[in-house]
A protein has these predicted regions:
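Alpha-helical phosphate/pyrophosphate-handling elements in metalloenzyme active cores
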Residues: 200-228
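Active-site flanking loop/helix segments enriched in acidic
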Residues: 191-209, 241, 245-246
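Histidine-centered divalent metal-coordination motifs
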Residues: 18-21, 206, 236
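Nucleotidyltransferase catalytic core that binds NTPs
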Residues: 1-195
């Protein structure tokens, strides 16, 4: 087995993972030419407004495995997801872990331009800068403004006009791979996001109670079918308030 000299690190919520993530990763790989790329779903992003991702850690990990399955020399790491519960994912800890695991490798960290601009807010950002080379994704050459004190490599990201929030409401084949969409549908991911927009608040609260009760019953009589019970409970009244124009 050849020695790993260059590692590209790509972390994020991946909630859900979409083609923008895949294309950005491919662009960075083409630029850096790493021996290994490591995709790292994070547990709780410190600089995001929400404390928890909508999908579970396990589901986001599984979606990443599906989305990046066709890419060679790539691993999906659960390192950050295995950290203490309710603790933010700090990149510097991941860097420390990877340096111990691959002591002879040079590390490259892929970040978006927005994250690059607030990089000084990252926990122990100076440590990170001393141990990795930043690979900064930009949407066009006019946005490039890399500081001289940061050893950074610009890479042009493809333009994907979609947000993860929109995809949580409605998965879209144009922006997501079919295996990921199938996984979302089969496992009832983002069901609450979806259902909330299809019914009144009264009906939605009723639906949540039914789903909770269905899960409680399933845990008692059919523990392996708890997720299916939840999905059935969430969607049992989905068409209740539909009319002829819905």
């Amino acid at each position: 087995m050849s020695k790993i000299k260059k590692i590209l690190i790509f972390g994020g919520s991946f909630d859900p993972v979409h083609k923008g993530h895949i294309d950005s990763c491919n662009s960075a790989i083409a630029k850096v030419d790493p021996d290994l790329t490591i995709i790292i779903p994070n547990k709780i992003p410190p600089l995001k407004s929400t404390l928890h991702a909508s999908a579970s850690a396990r589901d986001r990990l599984n979606m990443c495995k599906l989305a990046f399955s066709n890419m060679g020399n790539l691993k999906i790491s659960s390192f950050e997801l295995r950290q203490a519960s309710n603790a933010p994912s700090y990149t510097y800890k991941t860097i420390q872990y990877l340096l111990k695991k691959y002591p002879e490798a040079k590390l490259y960290l892929l970040v978006g331009y927005d994250r690059y601009c607030d990089f000084n807010k990252w926990k122990n950002y100076k440590y990170i800068l001393n141990h990795v080379t930043l690979v900064v994704g930009i949407r066009n050459t006019n946005t490039l403004d890399l500081k001289d004190d940061k050893k950074s490599i610009p890479v042009l990201f493809p333009s994907v006009n979609i947000s993860s929030a929109e995809l949580r409401l409605k998965p879209n084949k144009e922006y997501m791979t079919e295996p990921v969409i199938n996984y979302i549908n089969e496992n009832g991911l983002y069901a609450e996001n979806h259902i909330r927009n299809l019914m009144s608040e009264y009906r939605f609260n009723h639906t949540l109670r039914v789903a909770k009760t269905a899960m409680q019953i399933a845990r008692a009589v059919a523990p392996k079918k708890v997720k299916k019970a939840y999905i059935a409970g969430m969607y049992h009244d989905v068409a209740k308030e539909f009319n002829e124009t819905t």
